[in-house]
Regions:
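Conserved short beta-strand edge segments in small beta-sheet-based binding/regulatory domains
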Residues: 28-31, 71-73
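Short beta->alpha connector loops
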Residues: 10-11, 34-35, 60
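C-terminal structural segments of small proteins and small subunits
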Residues: 45-73
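Non-catalytic helical tethers at domain boundaries
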Residues: 18, 35-39, 43, 64
Length: 73
């Protein structure tokens, strides 16, 4: 599963990191050739100003994933 989001600024990246950390499954962000764990603060700060795909395994609950992405936006 994946959805695109824009990571606007440092505070937005921190919020995404917190939400990903609370998730019951692993959440990743992909931008170009970069793939980072969304729960990693250091990794998230490298994504500021980029459009990224929020990625999770397909065997996770789709509705839960969509709710998570809506909170991240």
């Amino acid at each position: 599963m994946n959805r695109e989001i824009d990571i606007r600024n440092r505070e937005h990246a921190i919020n995404i990191c917190k939400l990903a950390g609370k998730s019951s499954y692993e959440v990743w962000l992909s931008a170009g050739t970069t793939l980072v764990n969304a729960a990693s603060m250091l990794s998230m700060l490298t994504m500021v100003g980029k459009t990224a795909s929020v990625v999770a395994r397909d065997d996770n609950d789709a509705q839960s994933f969509l709710r998570l992405v809506r909170e991240m936006v």
